[in-house]
């Protein structure tokens, strides 16, 4: 971080899930539209080292960065809103901070000192914030996870309080997001929760510079005056975060209120006028959709749609590009069997099986894949979805009835999917893994090149000889079965650069049947979409019309 970089800290109060991530990303979008180089960071107060081993039903999606970090789903928002790509430096947790401090303590780096939250933990938080910001960055927006008042968040709040003192008011800004409940029976907006949230923040030693008030409806100047009086925040630094039809409207709403202009003023930024024409085009495209197409997503985390956040957004973005609204029908794979499979898919235009781990619900996914293959329904498989598509093909086309994955059935005699014991990273380093290795951080993670087969549908879709997609898996197609699968009509249309790992499959006789080992949803954005998803949605539209 250079001596001119400004930092905006975004905190949240009253309740969680107010949309801190979207607010932070929207502010970054606005500043980027003014010609500034903006990066973002998420600080998570949980004690896990990273979210890699956490249940998606508790934490939501694990977003994978290009350099292979398993991170919070908010980093997905960041990449969809701004152009800069996130790295492992853009997200860290309490667990990671303590891990670093304790490792140094074991090495004797603290020279026998008593290790305490202050200064050792807070110093490590400050170090990670400052070292994670590149020298060419004009503004860094740092989101503090959790809610003010949570015991877990206190070391992070203390660290940013200290950074305000060390860097000065001209280089730091505190933006606090709170809730203004609207009581319909009384027809009133209540400001008391916001007052108490700001008071709680002040008790920690932080005075909010800007307030963002989440509310169902706009509030008038009388409410603003009341909030300003009791929170010690200037009235012109209080903004509304009202409910919108799509999160991509949020930057435009903030711009209309003059939010970005106020940030430029408060931080004395050398910025040009905002050019939001590209972002306005995104919103116009969303508003202009005419038709609707229904996609069945067959998974085991469907009770929490946040578990598939990037995938949902990739489907929606592809739909916008094709002029349709994508409706996702979430199907719990545990409920699907041979007797009821048709009832789940008779009204859908396409079927998708996403990534996942573990054996629960696997047979329901395989039955769904078989139904898509046999009934010429456009199908997209991702990660585990590709592995199960290979298993289904081996069972029902090759006739290997006990074909399985050694992850799901360790004693299977025909492991068409097996553990990757060794692979080479993009930088040339060789990674190795065994069945006894730790689960956390030991997968094939991050961006890897995939070489596309000439004449394949995948090559036609991507319009490239090779692509880079992000991975998060331990298991791959067993190379011992590849030749037999190809002879039976399955095409491996994408392979790793060294030709050892199978990355893409397709069935040429099928209307649209593609599965990939990578997670292409992580690189889809509302500005640019993603070619694979757009082709998939186009196939769904054509199938729906027929």
Curated annotation (Swiss-Prot):
Homotetramer. Allosterically activated by GTP, when glutamine is the substrate; GTP has no effect on the reaction when ammonia is the substrate. The allosteric effector GTP functions by stabilizing the protein conformation that binds the tetrahedral intermediate(s) formed during glutamine hydrolysis. Inhibited by the product CTP, via allosteric rather than competitive inhibition. Belongs to the CTP synthase family. It catalyses: UTP + L-glutamine + ATP + H2O = CTP + L-glutamate + ADP + phosphate + 2 H(+); L-glutamine + H2O = L-glutamate + NH4(+); UTP + NH4(+) + ATP = CTP + ADP + phosphate + 2 H(+). Its EC number is 6.3.4.2. GO terms for cellular component: cytosol. NCBIfam families: PRK05380.1, PyrG. This is CTP synthase. It is an enzyme of class 6 (ligase). GO terms for biological process: 'de novo' CTP biosynthetic process; pyrimidine nucleobase biosynthetic process. The active site is at residues 383, 519, 521. L-glutamine binds at residues 356, 384-387, 407, 474. PROSITE patterns: GATASE_TYPE_1. Disulfide bonds: none annotated. Residues 1-269 are annotated as: Amidoligase domain. UTP binds at residues 16, 190-195, 226. ATP binds at residues 17-22, 74. SUPFAM superfamilies: Class I glutamine amidotransferase-like, P-loop containing nucleoside triphosphate hydrolases. One of its GO terms (molecular function) is glutaminase activity. Mg(2+) binds at residues 74, 143. CTP binds at residues 16, 150-152, 190-195, 226.
């Amino acid at each position: 971080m250079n001596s001119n970089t400004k930092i905006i800290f975004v905190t949240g109060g009253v309740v969680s899930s107010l949309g801190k991530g979207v607010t932070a990303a929207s502010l970054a979008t606005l500043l980027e539209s003014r010609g500034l180089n903006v990066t973002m960071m998420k600080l998570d107060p949980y004690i896990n080292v990273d979210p890699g081993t956490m249940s998606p039903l508790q934490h939501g999606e694990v977003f994978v960065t290009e350099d292979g970090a398993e991170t919070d789903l908010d980093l997905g928002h960041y990449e969809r809103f701004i152009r800069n790509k996130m790295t492992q430096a853009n997200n860290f947790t309490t667990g990671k901070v303590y891990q670093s401090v304790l490792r140094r303590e074991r090495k004797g780096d603290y020279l026998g000192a008593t290790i305490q939250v202050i200064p050792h933990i807070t110093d490590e938080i400050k170090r990670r914030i400052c070292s994670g910001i590149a020298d060419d960055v004009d503004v860094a927006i740092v989101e503090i996870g959790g809610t003010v008042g949570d015991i877990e968040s206190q070391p992070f709040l203390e660290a940013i309080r200290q950074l305000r003192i060390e860097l000065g008011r001209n280089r730091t800004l505190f933006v606090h997001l709170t809730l203004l409940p609207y009581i319909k029976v009384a027809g009133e907006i209540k400001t008391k929760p916001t007052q108490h949230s700001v008071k709680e923040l002040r008790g920690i030693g932080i005075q909010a510079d800007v307030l963002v008030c989440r509310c169902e409806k706009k509030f008038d100047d009388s409410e603003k005056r009341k909030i300003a009086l009791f929170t010690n925040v200037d009235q012109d630094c209080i903004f509304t975060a009202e409910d919108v039809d799509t999160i991509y409207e949020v930057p435009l709403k903030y711009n209309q209120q003059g939010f970005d202009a106020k940030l430029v003023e408060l931080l004395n930024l050398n910025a040009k006028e905002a050019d939001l024409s590209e972002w306005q085009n995104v919103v116009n495209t969303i508003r202009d959709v005419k038709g609707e197409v229904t996609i069945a997503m067959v998974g085991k985390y469907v009770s929490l749609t946040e578990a598939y956040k990037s995938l949902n957004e990739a489907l929606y973005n592809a739909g916008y590009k094709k002029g349709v609204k994508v409706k996702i029908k979430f199907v719990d794979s545990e409920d699907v069997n041979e007797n009821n499979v048709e009832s789940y898919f008779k009204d859908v235009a396409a079927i998708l099986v996403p990534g996942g781990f573990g054996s629960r619900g696997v047979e329901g996914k395989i039955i769904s894949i078989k139904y898509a293959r046999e009934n010429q329904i456009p199908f997209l498989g991702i990660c585990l979805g590709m592995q199960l598509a290979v298993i289904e093909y081996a069972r029902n086309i090759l006739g290997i009835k006990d074909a399985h994955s050694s992850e799901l059935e360790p004693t299977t005699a025909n492991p068409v999917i097996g553990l990757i014991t060794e692979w080479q990273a993009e930088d040339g380093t060789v990674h190795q893994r065994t069945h006894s290795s730790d689960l956390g951080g030991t997968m094939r993670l991050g961006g890897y090149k995939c070489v596309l087969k000439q004449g394949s549908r995948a090559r036609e879709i991507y319009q490239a000889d090779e692509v880079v997609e992000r991975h998060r898996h331990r298991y791959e197609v067993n190379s011992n079965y590849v030749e037999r699968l190809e002879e039976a009509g399955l095409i491996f249309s994408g392979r790793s650069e060294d030709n050892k790992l199978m990355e893409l499959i397709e069935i040429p006789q099928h209307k649209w049947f593609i599965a990939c080992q990578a997670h292409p949803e992580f690189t889809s954005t509302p500005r640019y979409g993603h070619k694979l998803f757009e082709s998939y949605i186009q196939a769904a539209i054509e199938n729906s019309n027929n």
